[in-house]
Amino acid sequence: MYELKEKSYPMQPRERLELLGEEYLSDVELLAILLRTGRKKYSSLNLALELLQHFGTLDNFRKASISELKEISGIGQTKAIELRAMIELGKRIQTTTRKRYGQVLSSKEYGMSLAFEMQNFEQEHLTATYLDGQNQIIEKKTIFIGAFNHATASPREILYHAVKNLSVGLLVAHNHPSGNLQPSQADKIFTKKIKNACDNIGINFIDHIIVGAGNYYSFRERDSNLF
């Protein structure tokens, strides 16, 4: 069994979370925080590492029963129950989020929904919608408000949140306050940049939708060369 040394983690997980934010911690560090303690001569980091190595994947860990968790030395009845409670709470939070946001069934349905949602926006808004494998919406995020410069726009922030959310699919949308739905050349270039970036990291770029005057334009529906 590989053992983590203190020098591998110059700061303890709680300190790193407070300083950097939880998204910068490894799976081992996050689990170590939840475990709080290890066992004799064995830190919580080492116990967390052993747990994850034993089950192989986070999905297998998620499915582990109390008795299966207790097979690991240092995981007693109390810790096993606490871990199961943590896993169940995470599942319920995810389910609540999905119920709140709903599911994307088609570009038409979602385009018309966005057209209604953004119809009174006087400034241009760029939004990103992140989906799981069943097209359930994980998060809807406003990326930019104002005179959006497509020429200098980078997919980086959009994809940062996609990776953070473990997204399988991505929809991007922006409004034209003028009501003119026709995409500019800059819109087309931006769409291609996002599509290429998604392809490079294995995320399904579902569509780029333009909305205005109560209607929508779908690149997927209208521009087959891009999709």
Swiss-Prot record:
Any GO molecular function: metal ion binding
Residue span, MPN domain: 103-225
SUPFAM superfamilies, per the entry: RuvA domain 2-like (SSF47781)
Record motif JAMM motif, residues: 174-187
PROSITE patterns: MPN, UPF0758
GO BP term (any one): proteolysis
Pfam families in the cross-refs: RadC, UPF0758_N
Keywords: Hydrolase, Metal-binding, Metalloprotease, Protease, Zinc
UniProt cross-references to InterPro entries, sorted A to Z: MPN (IPR037518), RadC_JAB (IPR025657), RuvA_2-like (IPR010994), UPF0758 (IPR001405), UPF0758_CS (IPR020891), UPF0758_N (IPR046778)
Binding residue positions for Zn(2+): H174, H176, D187
Annotated family: Belongs to the UPF0758 family.
PANTHER family: DNA REPAIR PROTEIN RADC (PTHR30471), UPF0758 PROTEIN YEES-RELATED (PTHR30471:SF3)
Protein name: UPF0758 protein llmg_1515
Native organism: Lactococcus lactis subsp. cremoris (strain MG1363)
